[in-house]
């Protein structure tokens, strides 16, 4: 049997179910209790912020030159999340104490290079504290192999009315990397509609399903329209 010590049990169990036929067991690992004072967006171990209800506003755009895609709505949501987290100074300093040895505490994984570019650009436009800035890392899934962060935010990026998923997003190892980098908290931002029906058997469809079915166990699906305002209110 394989045992993993990196991920919180909920994340480990999901990864085990999707990629290892349930054979990956969770080792004992203490999750630091800094999350007791964390912003409300981090109350759950795993969250999916579902952008479907934004309709066509949730759709991705294609780069003018090049083949990559980006998604402005998702980028804005992620910047809002980071703002909410950054305002909670008590939490930030606790997080920063845990990760003194230099690894970023919060990783943003983009499924497409153009989305990384957009997010880095939006991130640079904001006046963050130096401490917070050094805690954030924004990269593509392919740049993430072998790394881990306490908190991972994934930008799914792809969203349209055809719901066609490209090969790129079907590759289990790629999705496995994205989902298994998170040690304590995993937030997925993207259209849930893309991953039901014909795509529900793909790894990301199974992830959405897992989060939906474990809402009493530290997982939650937020509807961007109705419930996202909950994420905004209250700082922990």
PLM regions with names:
Residues 23-121:
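Conserved helicase/translocase motor-coupling segment
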Residues 98, 127, 161-236:
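Helicase C-terminal subdomain and adjacent C-terminal extension
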Residues 1-32, 111, 194-195:
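Conserved coupling/interface region of RecA-like P-loop/ASCE motor cores
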Residues 5-8, 113-116, 144-145, 158-161, ...:
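Conserved nucleotide-binding/hydrolysis micro-motifs of P-loop NTPases
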Residues 139, 143-159, 176-177, 185-189:
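A short beta-strand element within the Helicase C-terminal
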Residues 5-8, 12, 75-79, 169-179:
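Amphipathic alpha-helical transducer elements in NTP-driven molecular machines
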Residues 9-10, 57-59, 117-118, 147-149, ...:
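Switch/connector loops and helix/strand junctions flanking conserved nucleotide-binding motifs
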Residues 25, 107, 125-140:
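Conserved RecA-like helicase motor-core motifs
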């Amino acid at each position: 049997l394989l045992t993993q010590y990196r991920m919180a049990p909920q994340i480990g169990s999901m990864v085990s179910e999707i990629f290892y036929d349930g054979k990956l067991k969770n080792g004992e690992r203490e999750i630091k209790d800094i999350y007791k004072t964390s912003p409300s967006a981090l109350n759950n171990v795993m969250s999916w912020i579902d952008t479907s209800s934004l309709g066509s506003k949730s759709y991705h755009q294609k780069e003018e030159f090049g083949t990559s895609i980006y998604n402005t709505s998702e980028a804005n949501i992620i910047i809002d999340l980071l703002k909410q987290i950054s305002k909670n100074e008590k939490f930030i300093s606790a997080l920063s104490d845990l990760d003194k040895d230099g690894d970023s505490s919060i990783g943003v994984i983009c499924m497409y290079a153009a989305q990384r570019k957009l997010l880095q650009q939006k991130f640079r436009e904001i006046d963050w504290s130096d401490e917070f800035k050094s805690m954030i890392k924004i990269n593509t899934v392919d740049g993430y192999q072998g790394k881990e962060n306490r908190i991972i935010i994934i930008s799914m990026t792809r969203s349209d009315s055809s719901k066609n998923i490209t090969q790129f997003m079907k590759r289990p190892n790629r999705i496995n990397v994205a989902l298994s980098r998170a040690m304590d908290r995993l937030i997925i931002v993207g259209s849930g509609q893309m991953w039901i029906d014909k795509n529900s058997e793909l790894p990301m469809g199974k992830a959405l399903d897992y989060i939906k079915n474990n809402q009493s166990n530290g997982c939650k699906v937020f509807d961007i329209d109705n419930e996202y305002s909950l994420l905004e209110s209250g700082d922990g």
